[in-house]
Amino acid sequence: MTSTSQQFLAALTEYPDGALGPRELCVSCVKVLPVDRAALTIGGASTTWEPLSATDETAARIEAHQVVTGEGPAVDAAERGGPVLVDDLSLEFDRWPGFTTALGRDAYGAMFAFPLQIGAIAIGVLDLYRNEPVPIEPDELTAMLAVADIVTMVLMSRPPLADVDANAADSWWTPSPSSSEIHQATGMVVAQLSAPPRVAYLRLRAHAFAQDRPLTEVAREVIERRLRFDPDDDPLPELAN
């Protein structure tokens, strides 16, 4: 076990029984790694995405932009099954035009995305951020990979610590109110379009992207029957891939 892994495990033991959750995992990442913020998003290349937690509002906004645009380091990391390392987000417009445009003033610094997976089982992505556009060093990459492995094990309800309640992890998967709204709205759009859930989700996301609005707001309009999708309307091409 690397020294960084030991430091990370030690940071997790600082939390009392039952208090170790997604936010604590993110905060512990910042404590032991050379990064300024961290965030967790649950989902995969063929599923919907849900931000799970973040250390601050900036990280939370960036995660939300990835969910809405379907672009960004986390999306690519999930699709490739390997880390995506970005030294400077401000230079990545050609790579992720929708994502970087949506970022606006947040398009700065470095971002490193690590898929959370064990074998063929993938559950999400750990995103790590630096305020400055500083390239990652080999030893830093090794440390981040080690921490991502531990985060994966904890999120998969296999806590590596003897004093962590194994049942506590189960409650992390309870959808937040906003996530529940997105799921409910997706189901309603499935009925409206007579389409698979992923297509319905893409239509929701495309509408949010086109209007530069949070996905949760669009979902709420669908639930309240103030917005209905027409099968004859095509989603934005860049979001339909």
Predicted regions and their residues:
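Short beta-strand-to-loop transition segments that serve as allosteric relay/switch motifs
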Residues: 125-134, 139
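Short hydrophobic beta-strand micro-motif common in sensory/regulatory domains
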Residues: 110-117
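Signal-transducing alpha-helical linker
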Residues: 4, 152-160, 177
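Regulatory sensory and allosteric helical modules in signal-transduction proteins
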Residues: 43, 59-95, 101-109
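Signal-transducing coiled-coil/dimerization helices and immediately adjacent hinge/linker segments
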Residues: 160-241
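Intrinsically disordered, low-complexity terminal regulatory regions
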Residues: 1-68, 220-241
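Allosteric cytosolic regulatory segments
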Residues: 141-152
